[in-house]
């Protein structure tokens, strides 16, 4: 079907173009055209068939502006789509690890940190997972350009900290060790420690300190001793397991109060020993 528009449809599209709308709801259509929701749904359905709108979920559409050409080719950048689904947000965990080259694992799920609660969402071949953070943890991100699109991405230091904070969203403890190994070559150590302390999470500090020591002992990474010392006062009294999902046994590291329940060979499986 051609992208030709009726008078009412033209009014809506011009308004959306003028407002630079990316996401359009049925309520938006009803408000702009001053019509009932049932009428708005019919109009939205027609515009979907004419490739001016692409359905994201019930009553929610991606607007495909005139600049996308006569065929109405929608955007193919899932990072753009994700950025339009929730506010505030920033990409983190496996997604930002891949962006900075801290991980070579390419995962189909895109992880967005937010202070809101949102259900997971699928668009084409991409799965979006929304990770709800407390407000004091929602910091340390910047605007970056990816494939011509500007999105919010965790800073390198916050990427590492977030990954240690929520291991399962970064591929598990073995993958996170590799992330730290690669990240320590690029991040600012002082900022890394400061961000870790700002999270107000003893377990995070304990795991990060333990994993940094593993890399130091293997001789595959370096870390300033004074920054390591800044972490130690924030070690909690309670001992924790390195891998929360692992075996409930292992040797206790007294400095970090971490029970190493992952065999060394398994823990280092994702780290390139040089």
Task: Label the model's feature ranges.
Residues 1-88, 185-205, 213:
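Short beta-edge/loop segments at beta->alpha junctions of small alpha/beta modules
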Residues 23-27, 40-42, 98-105, 236-247:
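Short N-terminal helix-initiation segments at or just after the protein's N-terminus
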Residues 32, 99-100, 163, 211:
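Generic structural signal for bulky hydrophobic/aromatic residues embedded
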């Amino acid at each position: 079907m051609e992208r030709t528009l009726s008078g009412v449809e033209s009014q809506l599209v011009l308004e959306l173009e003028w407002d630079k709308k990316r996401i359009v709801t049925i309520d938006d259509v009803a408000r702009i055209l001053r019509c009932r929701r049932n009428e708005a749904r019919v109009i939205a359905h027609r515009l979907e068939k004419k490739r001016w709108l692409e359905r994201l979920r019930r009553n929610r559409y991606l607007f495909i502006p005139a600049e996308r050409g006569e065929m109405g080719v929608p955007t193919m950048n899932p990072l753009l789509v994700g950025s339009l689904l929730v506010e505030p947000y920033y990409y983190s965990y496996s997604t930002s690890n891949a962006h900075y080259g801290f991980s070579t694992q390419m995962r189909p799920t895109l992880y967005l940190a937010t202070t809101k609660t949102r259900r997971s969402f699928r668009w084409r071949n991409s799965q979006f997972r929304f990770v709800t953070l407390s407000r004091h943890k929602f910091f340390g991100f910047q605007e970056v350009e990816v494939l011509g699109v500007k999105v919010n991405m965790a800073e390198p230091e916050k990427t590492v900290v977030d990954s240690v904070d929520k291991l399962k969203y970064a591929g598990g403890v073995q993958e996170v060790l590799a992330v730290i190994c690669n990240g320590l070559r690029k991040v600012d150590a002082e900022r890394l420690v400061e961000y870790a302390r700002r999270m107000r999470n003893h377990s995070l500090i304990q795991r990060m300190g333990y994993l940094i020591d593993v890399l130091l002992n293997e001789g595959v990474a370096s870390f300033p001793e004074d920054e390591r010392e800044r972490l130690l006062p924030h070690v909690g009294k309670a001992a924790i397991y390195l891998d929360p999902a692992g075996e409930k046994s292992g040797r206790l590291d007294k400095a970090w109060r971490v029970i190493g329940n992952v065999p060394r060979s398994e823990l280092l499986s994702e780290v390139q020993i040089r």
